[in-house]
C-alpha cells in the first residue's frame, strides 16, 4: 500500500534536532534491561513549582490544605516555597514551622537562587526547623548562557560555586537545624553533559558530599527536549560520572513539554536515579511537571508499593482541584472521571466476564475476591483499590442516552447536572432501556429522572417512596459558630421533630441522620439558579457516600439552604430504596 502522506508545508527548517545541540552517547547503556522493583524517594513540589504556574496562586489557606494532603498521602520531602522571592512564601514557611505543622519525619524543602541576599533570606525563613533541604539552582544550558546571562562556562561555574559557598556560610546561623543540600543545574537537558557534571561535582565538593553527608543532585528536564530514552542515557552517564557517587542522591525533575514526562521519569529512574520531583496530576509550568499520581500508580499496577497512599483518589483529586483552582482532565490516568469507564459494548462485555472469572477464581481458592490477583480486561487496576466504585465501569455513552439526557435536562428543565451526576443518570436510563427496549422519549426520560432523584408523595401513580421528607426547618448560628438545625421531618410517613448541630446546616443534618443510624458523608456539592430573578428556585446537587455506595442527590427549593438539605435527603432515600442501608 502506498503511503499517501504529503509534506505539511510547516517551517520545520527553523528547528534544530536535539543531537545537533547536545551530544549524548552511551553505547554501553544498562537501563533497558532493568526493572522497577522499589519506589524512589519522592519530593512533591506542588507548593512551589506547581503554585508558580497557577492563574490564581494558592492563598495561605489553600497552601496549608495542600501541605496537609501531601503529608497525609505519605510524602516525606515537600518543597514548600521560594522564601526569598516573596513575603507570601516567606510567611508560609514561617507558618509551617511556628505552627507545628511539620511532622517529625517530614523534611521541608526551600528554593533559592545563587545570590547572597536571597540565600541569607532563605536561612532566615528556616529558623526553628528541625530539618530542611536548601535547594540551590542556577541555569547552565547553552541557550541560557548565551541569551540570558551572556556568560561563558567559567562564569556560570563561578556563579554555582559561589552560591554553594554562601550556603555554607549562612548555614552557621542555623545551629539547631539539620540541613541537606540540593543543587540543580537548571535546564540540564540543554547543557553539555561534560560541563554539567563538572559543575555538579564542584558544588558537591563544596557541600562536602559523602556517604554520611549526602547531597541531592537534581537534573531537571526544565524543558523536555528529546525522547525519554535519550534522557535516560544522560541520567545513566551522569550517574557514572558524579563523585563521590555514594555521597550523591541523584534526583529527577522532568517536565511534560513533549507529553512524555512520566516515561522520562521511569526510564531515568531505571538509569540510576534515586529520587523524583513532581506534582500531583502534573500541574506546573507550560505542559506541567511530571505527574506523581501516574508515576506512583504505574508502580502500584505492577505490584510495586509506591510508598504513597492513593486509596482515596477522588478525595485527592477534589483537594488538588480546590487548591489549584484547576480541574483534573476527565481522561487523567487513574484520577479522571472517565478512566475506568468502558463505553464500548465489547469492552463492557469483556469486563463483565473478567469480574465473573475473578469470582470463580476466588471461590475455587477459598479466598475473598479482594485477595485475588487482579486480572480484568481494560482495567489496569481495581477501581476499589483507589476508593472508586464499580458503578463507573458500567456507565454508557451518548448512544445510550447520556448526551441526550444532559441536553434535555438543561434546555427544557434548566438542570445543569455535574458531569459525574450526568454519567450516573445515564446508567439509570440504560437500565430502563435494557428492561423495556425501544426508544425512550423525552417525557419518559424526565419521568425517569424525577422518579430516581425526587421522592414521590403519597398517591403518586408510581407509588410513594422515600423514608425521609424534609418539612419546616430553621437554622441558627450558635455563639461558638456552629449551626443548630431544628426541623420537622417525616420519617416513614410519621412527622417527627429532630435537632442537630454542626459546622453549617448540611453538617447538622448529617448528624441528625447519623443519630438515626444512617452513615452519610458529603463528597461534592454544587448548585445553581433555575431561572433569573428574585423568585428563582435553586437546584442543589450533592454527591454522598451512603454506607458503601457513592451516589448523587437532587434538591429543588427557592431557599438554597433548603435545596441543599433536600439533596442530601434525596441521596439517602435513594440508597435506602436500593437496600444500601437499613
Curated annotation (Swiss-Prot):
Family annotation (InterPro entries): 2-isopropylmalate_synth_dimer (IPR013709), AIPM/Hcit_synth_CS (IPR002034), Aldolase_TIM (IPR013785), IPM_Synthase (IPR005668), LeuA-like_post-cat (IPR054692), LeuA_allosteric_dom_sf (IPR036230), LeuA_N_DRE-TIM (IPR039371), PYR_CT (IPR000891)
Regulatory domain as annotated region, ranges: 456-582
One Pfam family recorded for the sequence: HMGL-like
Gene3D superfamilies: 3.30.160.270, Aldolase class I
Primary enzyme class: transferase
Pathway: Amino-acid biosynthesis; L-leucine biosynthesis; L-leucine from 3-methyl-2-oxobutanoate: step 1/4
Binding site residues for Mg(2+): 49, 253, 255, 289
Domain Pyruvate carboxyltransferase: 40-314
EC number: 2.3.3.13
Family: Belongs to the alpha-IPM synthase/homocitrate synthase family. LeuA type 2 subfamily.
Known function: Catalyzes the condensation of the acetyl group of acetyl-CoA with 3-methyl-2-oxobutanoate (2-ketoisovalerate) to form 3-carboxy-3-hydroxy-4-methylpentanoate (2-isopropylmalate).
NCBIfam families: leuA_yeast (TIGR00970), PRK03739.1 (NF002991)
UniProt-recorded name of the protein: 2-isopropylmalate synthase
Amino acid at each position: 500500500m502506498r503511503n499517501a502522506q504529503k509534506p505539511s508545508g510547516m517551517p520545520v527548517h527553523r528547528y534544530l534536532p536535539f543531537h545537533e545541540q547536545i551530544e549524548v552517547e552511551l553505547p554501553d547503556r544498562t537501563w533497558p534491561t532493568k526493572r522497577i522493583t522499589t519506589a524512589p524517594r519522592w519530593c512533591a513540589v506542588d507548593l512551589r513549582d506547581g503554585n508558580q504556574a497557577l492563574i490564581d496562586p494558592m492563598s495561605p489557606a489553600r497552601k496549608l490544605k495542600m501541605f496537609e494532603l501531601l503529608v497525609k498521602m505519605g510524602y516525606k520531602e515537600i518543597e514548600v516555597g521560594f522564601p526569598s522571592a516573596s513575603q507570601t512564601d516567606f510567611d508560609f514557611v514561617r507558618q509551617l514551622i511556628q505552627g507545628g505543622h511539620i511532622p517529625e519525619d517530614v523534611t521541608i524543602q526551600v528554593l533559592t537562587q545563587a545570590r547572597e541576599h536571597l540565600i541569607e533570606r532563605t536561612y532566615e525563613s528556616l529558623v526553628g526547623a528541625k530539618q530542611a533541604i536548601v535547594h540551590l539552582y542556577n541555569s547552565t544550558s547553552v541557550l541560557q548562557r548565551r541569551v540570558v546571562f551572556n556568560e561563558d562556562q567559567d562564569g556560570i561555574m563561578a556563579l554555582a560555586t559561589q552560591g554553594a559557598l554562601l550556603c555554607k556560610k549562612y548555614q552557621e546561623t542555623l545551629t539547631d537545624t539539620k540541613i541537606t543540600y540540593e543543587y540543580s543545574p537548571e535546564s540540564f537537558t540543554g547543557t553539555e553533559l561534560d560541563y554539567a557534571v563538572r559543575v555538579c561535582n564542584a558544588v558537591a565538593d563544596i557541600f562536602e558530599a559523602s556517604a554520611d553527608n549526602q547531597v541531592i543532585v537534581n537534573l531537571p528536564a526544565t524543558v523536555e527536549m528529546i525522547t525519554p530514552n535519550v534522557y535516560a542515557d544522560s541520567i545513566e552517564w551522569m550517574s557514572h560520572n558524579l563523585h563521590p557517587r555514594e555521597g550523591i542522591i541523584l534526583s529527577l525533575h522532568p517536565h511534560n513539554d513533549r507529553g512524555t514526562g512520566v516515561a522520562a521519569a521511569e526510564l531515568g529512574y531505571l538509569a540510576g536515579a534515586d529520587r523524583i520531583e513532581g506534582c500531583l496530576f502534573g500541574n506546573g509550568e507550560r505542559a506541567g511537571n511530571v505527574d506523581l499520581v501516574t508515576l506512583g500508580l504505574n508502580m502500584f499496577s505492577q505490584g510495586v508499593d509506591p510508598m504513597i497512599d492513593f486509596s482515596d483518589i477522588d478525595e485527592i483529586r477534589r483537594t488538588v482541584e480546590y487548591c489549584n483552582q484547576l480541574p483534573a482532565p476527565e481522561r487523567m490516568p487513574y484520577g479522571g472521571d472517565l478512566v475506568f469507564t468502558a463505553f464500548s459494548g465489547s469492552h463492557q462485555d469483556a469486563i463483565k466476564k473478567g469480574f465473573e472469572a475473578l469470582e470463580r477464581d476466588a471461590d475455587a481458592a477459598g479466598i475473598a475476591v479482594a485477595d485475588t490477583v487482579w486480572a480484568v480486561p481494560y482495567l489496569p487496576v481495581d477501581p476499589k483499590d483507589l476508593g472508586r466504585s464499580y458503578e463507573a465501569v458500567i456507565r454508557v455513552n451518548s448512544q445510550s442516552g447520556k448526551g441526550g439526557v444532559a441536553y434535555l435536562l438543561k434546555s427544557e428543565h434548566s438542570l445543569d447536572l455535574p458531569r459525574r451526576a450526568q454519567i450516573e443518570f445515564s446508567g439509570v436510563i440504560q437500565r430502563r432501556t435494557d428492561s423495556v427496549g425501544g426508544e425512550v422519549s423525552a417525557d419518559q426520560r424526565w419521568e425517569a429522572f424525577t422518579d430516581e432523584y425526587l421522592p414521590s408523595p403519597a398517591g403518586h401513580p408510581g407509588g410513594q417512596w422515600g423514608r425521609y421528607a424534609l418539612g419546616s426547618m430553621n437554622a441558627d448560628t450558635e455563639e461558638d459558630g456552629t449551626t443548630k438545625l431544628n426541623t420537622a421531618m417525616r420519617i416513614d410517613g410519621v412527622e417527627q421533630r429532630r435537632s442537630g448541630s454542626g459546622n453549617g446546616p448540611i453538617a447538622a443534618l448529617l448528624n441528625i441522620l447519623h443519630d438515626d443510624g444512617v452513615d452519610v458523608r458529603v463528597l461534592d456539592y454544587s448548585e445553581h439558579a433555575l431561572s433569573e430573578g428574585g423568585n428563582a428556585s435553586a437546584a442543589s446537587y450533592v454527591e454522598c457516600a451512603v454506607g458503601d455506595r457513592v451516589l448523587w442527590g437532587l434538591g429543588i427549593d427557592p431557599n438554597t439552604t433548603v435545596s441543599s438539605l433536600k439533596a442530601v435527603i434525596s441521596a439517602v432515600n435513594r440508597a435506602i430504596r436500593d437496600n444500601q442501608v437499613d
